[in-house]
Amino acid sequence: MQLIEANTVFSKIDFQEDIDYNIYPKSIYECPICKNKLSFNMQDFKKYSLNKNSSFPIEEQERIKKMLEFSKREEPNSFIDYYCPKCNTSTRIYFTVWAGGRYTSGSHLEFVVIDDDT
């Protein structure tokens, strides 16, 4: 299990609604295990805004929770769970959604937890 800062695996970590479009620009994520690249955009993060439902089995969720406790990191308000399509590594992207008044909102990618034991 690894906790990785988002800026080391994503090409873009900040999205703002009044500047970025829903599907462009994209942020490219590179899996640290197999180097597979996936693209994410603001719409992906809006879809999972304030998400607290995991698609991982309970055991996987518990391991991630323990990793956060061990790292002493505060849990951001949103996450996306998925399995790398190439190497099948369990991956959770943690991000913070924010509102900036009446006209804008956005997302800041914080860190990624991968289970390289799967």
Each language-model region and where it sits:
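Short, charged low-complexity linear segments at domain edges
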Residues: 1-15, 46-67
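Short cysteine-rich clusters marking metal-coordination/redox-active sites
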Residues: 29-34, 84-87
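Short microdomains enriched in Cys/His and/or Lys/Arg
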Residues: 51-75, 104-118
